[in-house]
Curated annotation (Swiss-Prot):
It comes from the Bacteria. InterPro entries: DUF167, YggU-like_sf. The lineage of its organism: Bacteria, Bacillati, Actinomycetota, Actinomycetes, Mycobacteriales. Belongs to the UPF0235 family. This is UPF0235 protein MSMEG_3845. Transmembrane segments: none annotated.
Length: 75
């Protein structure tokens, strides 16, 4: 069974790496990596996996590869 997590990404942030949870359950993830060549997506995947306590191999980007609002599938 898989779960979907909605994430708002803030790439190139001086605040990161950091995960914040909004009242509606949406996660905001701040990463220092810029959104170039998938570096920010890779950093978000690793940080989200650590936040959820699962291996990074179980976290898959479902949609939003080039958007700031992303959906990740956790298997």
């Amino acid at each position: 069974m898989s779960e979907t997590v909605v994430v708002r990404v803030k790439p190139g942030s001086r605040k990161g790496p950091l995960v914040e949870t909004a009242d509606d359950g949406t996660l905001t993830i701040y990463v220092q990596e810029r959104a170039v060549d998938g570096k920010a997506n890779a950093a978000v995947t690793k940080l989200l996996a650590a936040h959820l306590g699962v291996p990074p191999s179980r976290v898959e980007l479902a949609s939003g590869a080039t958007a700031r609002l992303k959906r990740f599938r956790i298997s």
